Amino acid sequence: MRKACSPAEPVFTHPEFDHETRIVSAIVAGVSVSSIYVPNGGKDFNAKIRFLEALIAHAHRCAAEGQPIVFCGDLNVAHREIDVHPKERKETVIGQLPEERALIGRLLAEGLVDVGRTLDPENDQLFTWWPPWRAMRQRNIGWRIDYVLASAAVAAKAVACAAYREVGTSDHAPVVAEI
């Protein structure tokens, strides 16, 4: 990957969030690859919504310019019901609210593909985050809020995408895609 990287100016900037360094990007073999950490919304739900709307606008610009992209990281939204363990499903909590899920839908409508879900569409155990109590991680009672989203042409080259639950350095599992 190092040989395929090239320096680039920031491709997604937002004055409200830049000081938090919520996005790190690089151009890899002509593809804009961004690691993203969406605000969880607990302290300022509207800031989360503004961030997601800005991300959608950025994806739209990239699509209009023909720039292939990969967004990976913590989006802090369980997009669909299958992305939350039945014991954790609560459509009234942040991370599962209909308006948040709709924004992820809008992001995908900009031509992005959910690589993990595409490669394993019916798996209801693809969780990437677990509440830090009652051995939730060990029992795999969690949420899928970490993703690899890619432009269709890039996603078509994906051969694998997995969450490594056994890596316990965080309350999230790293998600790795092989493209």
PLM regions and their residue ranges:
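Short, solvent-exposed helix-loop connector elements
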Residues: 130-131, 158-165
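Surface-exposed cleft-lining segments at the edges of enzyme active sites
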Residues: 13-14, 37-52, 88-92
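Surface polyanion/phosphate-binding segment centered on an Asp-His-Pro turn
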Residues: 162-179
